[in-house]
């Protein structure tokens, strides 16, 4: 008889840390009566704008390949909603890609981002803590995709930046900042 091998589902390291340590600490810090009031993560959106794709549609393929390697899932191609003559842009032309990460993929991506990718940025002094949107969500940009280990530096066709948005259930920026700081986001200290 053939044996069906049961593979154990491994919980991401950062998710375990959040459940066991961070959630309790935040509940004490903000004096919540209910554990469900503690801010958590909803999703992470990684967006790569590729404006040059309007002139050459092959450029978008490189961005899709890079984003697939970084996030571990196939990204959506963003198309232009309106035609803009000054940019030589027609409605429906591909102008970027984005991937929305939820669940375990989100936790794994954030773990890799905080522990491996951000420390590889040259002259990195920390993330600005002024980029919250007022509702506890945080957006920041990376100027090149080579900070991720998944990208082979010899095989990149061009340097592409990306925007990363971390959506949380926090009610305000202070809660969001406390959550991300506890998760290991390196914010600038001297302001």
Swiss-Prot record:
Report the transmembrane regions from the record: none
Q: Function, please?
A: This is one of the proteins that bind and probably mediate the attachment of the 5S RNA into the large ribosomal subunit, where it forms part of the central protuberance. In the 70S ribosome it contacts protein S13 of the 30S subunit (bridge B1b), connecting the 2 subunits; this bridge is implicated in subunit movement. Contacts the P site tRNA; the 5S rRNA and some of its associated proteins might help stabilize positioning of ribosome-bound tRNAs.
Q: Does the keyword Ribonucleoprotein apply?
A: yes
Tell me which species this is from: Micrococcus luteus (strain ATCC 4698 / DSM 20030 / JCM 1464 / CCM 169 / CCUG 5858 / IAM 1056 / NBRC 3333 / NCIMB 9278 / NCTC 2665 / VKM Ac-2230) (Micrococcus lysodeikticus)
Keywords attached to this entry = Ribonucleoprotein, Ribosomal protein, RNA-binding, rRNA-binding, tRNA-binding
Designated name of the protein = Large ribosomal subunit protein uL5
User: Per its record, what are the GO molecular function terms?
Assistant: rRNA binding; structural constituent of ribosome; tRNA binding
Subunit composition and interactions = Part of the 50S ribosomal subunit; part of the 5S rRNA/L5/L18/L25 subcomplex. Contacts the 5S rRNA and the P site tRNA. Forms a bridge to the 30S subunit in the 70S ribosome.
Name any GO cellular component annotation: ribonucleoprotein complex
Q: Which InterPro entries match?
A: Ribosomal_uL5 (IPR002132), Ribosomal_uL5_bac-type (IPR020930), Ribosomal_uL5_C (IPR031309), Ribosomal_uL5_CS (IPR020929), Ribosomal_uL5_dom_sf (IPR022803), Ribosomal_uL5_N (IPR031310)
Cite the NCBIfam families for this sequence. PRK00010.1 (NF000585)
Sorted alphabetically, which Pfam families does this protein's record hold? Ribosomal_L5, Ribosomal_L5_C
The Gene Ontology biological process annotation of the record reads:
translation
The UniProt similarity line reads: Belongs to the universal ribosomal protein uL5 family.
């Amino acid at each position: 008889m053939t044996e069906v091998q049961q593979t154990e589902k491994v919980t991401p390291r950062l998710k375990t840390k959040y459940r066991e340590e961070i959630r309790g600490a935040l509940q004490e810090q903000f004096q919540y009566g209910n554990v469900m009031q503690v801010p958590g993560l909803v999703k992470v959106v990684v967006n790569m704008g590729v404006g040059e794709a309007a002139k050459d549609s092959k450029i978008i393929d490189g961005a899709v390949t890079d984003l697939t390697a970084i996030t571990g899932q196939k990204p959506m191609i963003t198309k232009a909603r309106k035609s803009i003559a000054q940019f030589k842009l027609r409605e429906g032309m591909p102008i970027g890609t984005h991937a929305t990460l939820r669940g375990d993929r989100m936790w794994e991506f954030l773990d890799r981002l905080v522990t491996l990718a951000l420390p590889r940025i040259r002259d990195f002094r920390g993330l600005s803590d002024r980029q919250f949107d007022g509702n506890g969500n945080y957006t920041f940009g990376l100027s090149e995709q080579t900070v991720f280990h998944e990208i082979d530096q010899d095989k990149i066709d061009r340097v592409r930046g990306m925007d990363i948005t971390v959506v949380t259930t926090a009610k305000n920026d202070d809660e969001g900042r406390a959550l991300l700081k506890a998760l290991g986001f390196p914010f600038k200290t001297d302001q």
